[in-house]
Amino acid sequence: RRILGRLPPAAPPSLPQRPPAPPLYDPAELAGLIPADPRQPLPMRALLARIVDGSELDEFKANFGTTLITVRRAPRAQFGSQFRRDSCNYVEPSPSPMQGFARVHGYEVGIVANDGILFSESAVKGAHFVQLCAQRGVPLLFMQNITGFMVGKQYEHEGIAKHGAKLVNAVATANVPKLTVVVGGSFGAGNYGMCGRAYSPRFMWMWPNARIGIMGGEQAGGVLADVRAAQAKRQGTEFADADYAALKERMRERFDAEADPVFATARLWDDGIIEPTQTRAQIALGLATAANAPVEPTRFGVFRM
């Protein structure tokens, strides 16, 4: 290892770096921003203000597709300690995916963050932003708290499948370094659209409160119990209410257990569980590692129009 450490680098670092600046807000407050109930939204902008350099966030298309956040430069007062979740003064805006530019330890990153369901407008905005970062050679940081893409007849008529495919296409084919942090839920196709393990992020970490799976335990239990009840009805067999409740509870317990981050990490579905306060340092380490490899040009596939 010492001999190899003396070898010169193959090429200069591929990612430019400026002098780093600490966040204006204490990263130690991150754990206090996590809700006790995982069904409650995370204050994503407040989380990012405790991770990025100088708490400076330049948001992309802030008023379009508001369920996907693209970062903006925010005034100090917006993210001050008076807005901590454990304070009665804290008011969280509606769930919104977010994209935009910031720096972490001097490295520029394009941040794609969400807090809820992806709609058609959110997916289109996300695809646009990912393409922009790929063209500029800017690394992508995905902050996941996603329950999936919106479903229903109205949203299907509006093209959620087509527009969601644009986001998935852009994420899959962007060759810039991609890092993913699961700070909340990571469920269904939203895991793919937000650069889950199958989409080859350089690193993927999970917070201790994170959950990952095809769907939540409560939803999975209800769906599987409904399927079993419908099957029994077609076959003309009995499926009592007690059997329905027992199957629903059994499936809920199983899905909840397998959604635990320890279950995922034990199977190498990610690169480890990290403390929220260590998120900035882990991202910086991932970016420094990625800077040692050349950034290949991106060749996007065919986007559905």
What is each residue range found by the language model?
Residues R1-M305:
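Ligand-binding clefts of soluble mixed alpha/beta catalytic domains
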